Curated annotation (Swiss-Prot):
Gene from which the chain derives: Aqp9
Subunit architecture: Homotetramer; each monomer provides an independent glycerol/water pore.
Organism: Mus musculus (Mouse)
High-level lineage: Eukaryota, Metazoa, Chordata, Craniata, Vertebrata
Protein family according to the UniProt entry: Belongs to the MIP/aquaporin (TC 1.A.8) family.
A Pfam family of this chain: MIP
PANTHER family according to UniProt: AQUAPORIN OR AQUAGLYCEROPORIN RELATED, AQUAPORIN-9
Chain span(s) of sequence motif NPA 1: 84-86
Protein name as it appears in the record: Aquaporin-9
Length: 295
């Protein structure tokens, strides 16, 4: 028989456990986005602060993509692992998530990204102070703001940067929709995060030059706000012809466009396009995963 201590411990766990599904999902999105930012921006910080002696563009692309993979494995079964307001927006737009959850998901993602940026700043504080004699600069050879948020190259125009964000996020969601389409080739259960990681690597390697390939409003806006408050100043919002809004608005449009293209070109032409008829989930499938991203 369990001891009094074991029963007390079990009762404590039961009391602390969240009962609300929405609360669980919100907490999951916060944690997932936090993981992504700490490990992803951490890979950038390591490369920048070592002046590329401990990393470079390859390690950044692989590091950030792997950070997303780890975040997805941590959250898929609870919230669907969106960790991106653009993904949540697309899921709501195409009826894969209820709209009332949208502000909770986005709020958790924004907060998780902000706390993640603060964590990276704390971990690399000494390195940041030593990098440019204590100066926190946005641009130049001693610039460090792009550890946290994306900035356009000098040759990129505002329209060009906007199209860049729309197109890169369009490809992200187009392929994500394909990955979770049970009537297409699909991906073996449990390997979806790895394939998404590979997708992020190829997008970063092919469409990342112009403005850093954010594809995620939370990944860019919250860390940018943190840098504004932490010492880089509010020039982080005006730099690049007020570039800050482009990684926020562009991915939202691109996400819906990518989903729409997949639906119009592939999904609606399946032999059984009726959305009411769906394959029964296997016993080991996680319900939240099905509710969030099932095609």
């Amino acid at each position: 028989m369990p001891s009094e201590k074991d029963r007390a411990k079990k009762n404590l766990v039961q009391r602390l456990a969240l009962k609300s599904c929405l609360a669980k999902e919100t907490l999951s999105e916060f944690l997932g986005t936090f993981i992504m930012i700490v490990l992803g921006c951490g890979s950038i910080a390591q490369a920048v602060l070592s002046r590329e002696k401990a990393g470079g563009i390859i390690t950044i692309n692989i590091g950030f993509a792997t950070a997303v993979v780890m975040a997805l494995y941590a959250t898929f079964g609870v919230s669907g692992g969106h960790i991106n307001p653009a993904v949540s927006f697309a899921m709501c737009t195409f009826g894969r998530m209820e709209w009332f959850k949208f502000p909770f998901y986005v709020g958790a993602q924004l907060l998780g990204a902000f706390v993640g940026a603060a964590t990276v700043f704390g971990i690399y504080y000494d390195g940041l102070m030593a990098f440019a004699d204590g100066k926190l600069l946005i641009t130049g050879e001693n610039g460090t703001a792009f550890i946290f948020a994306t900035y356009p190259k000098p040759f990129v125009s505002v329209p060009g940067a906007f199209v860049d964000q729309v197109v890169s996020t369009m490809f992200l969601l187009l392929i994500v929709f394909a990955i979770f389409d049970s009537r297409n080739l699909g991906v073996p259960r449990g390997l979806e995060p790895i394939v998404i990681g590979l997708l992020i690597i190829v997008i970063s390697c092919s469409l990342g030059l112009n403005s850093g390939c954010a594809m995620n409003p939370a990944r860019d806006l919250s860390p940018r706000l943190f840098t504004a408050l932490a010492g880089w100043g509010f020039e982080v919002f005006t730099f690049g012809n007020n570039f800050w809004w482009i990684p926020v608005v562009g991915p939202m449009i691109g996400a819906v466009l990518g989903g729409l293209i997949y639906v119009l070109f592939i999904q609606m032409h399946h032999s059984n396009p009726d959305p009411e008829v769906k394959a029964e989930p296997a016993e080991n499938n996680l319900e939240k995963h099905e509710l969030s991203v099932i095609m």
